[in-house]
């Protein structure tokens, strides 16, 4: 996730001049687990950008049976940053964005070791795991270099958060390392 090659590729996909790591996380869907409701990523984060990008790396085969990701094509163009939460209802996001209700989501199975990239504003969710095994993935969210703090704590540690004011540039290399710049 820290490699300049991956940063360069991700930056070109996002159409930005530089990328910093926002955060990474493991996503483990247990056996017979419920679906993950459709949601957007950026509204949760401590910056506001239409150009943030996430890489989702399958550690196990992600299949229709064990909860692969689903994307709603073109939904990143909605450009709203309202945090509507990840509800219990898989389709609750469409109550807020009714204009996208009839756009068919596309399942994206991916083999172990494969990766998906998505814009932080694309509607996405994951199917149920209908198997006795785990469905594991690792994600890394990248923010464009130069993003500013929007007042949301999200994953920022309290010590760093205490130093920030709304509008401050999130350029702390210890917290959000620069992985690539054009």
Name these PLM-found stretches.
Residues 3-7, 31-43:
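Short acidic (Asp/Glu) patches
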Residues 16-19, 31, 42, 47-48, ...:
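Active-site region of the double-stranded beta-helix
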Residues 85-86, 115-117, 121-182:
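Non-heme Fe(II)/2-oxoglutarate
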């Amino acid at each position: 996730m820290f490699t300049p090659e991956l940063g360069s590729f991700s930056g070109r996909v996002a159409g930005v001049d530089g990328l910093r790591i926002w955060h990474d996380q493991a996503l483990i869907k247990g056996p017979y687990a419920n679906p993950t409701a459709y949601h957007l990523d950026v509204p949760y984060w401590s910056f506001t950008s239409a150009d943030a990008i996430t890489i989702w790396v399958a550690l196990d085969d992600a299949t229709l049976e064990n909860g692969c990701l689903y994307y709603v094509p073109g939904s990143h163009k909605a450009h709203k940053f309202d945090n509507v939460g990840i509800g219990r209802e898989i389709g609750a996001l469409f109550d807020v964005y009714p204009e996208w209700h009839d756009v068919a989501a596309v399942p994206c199975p991916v083999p172990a070791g494969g990766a998906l990239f998505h814009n932080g504003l694309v509607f996405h969710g994951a199917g149920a795991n209908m198997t006795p095994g785990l469905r594991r993935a690792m994600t890394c969210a990248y923010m464009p270099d130069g993003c500013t703090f929007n007042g949301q704590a999200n994953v920022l540690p309290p010590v760093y958060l205490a130093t920030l004011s709304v509008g401050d540039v999130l350029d702390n290399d210890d917290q959000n390392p620069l992985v690539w710049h054009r």
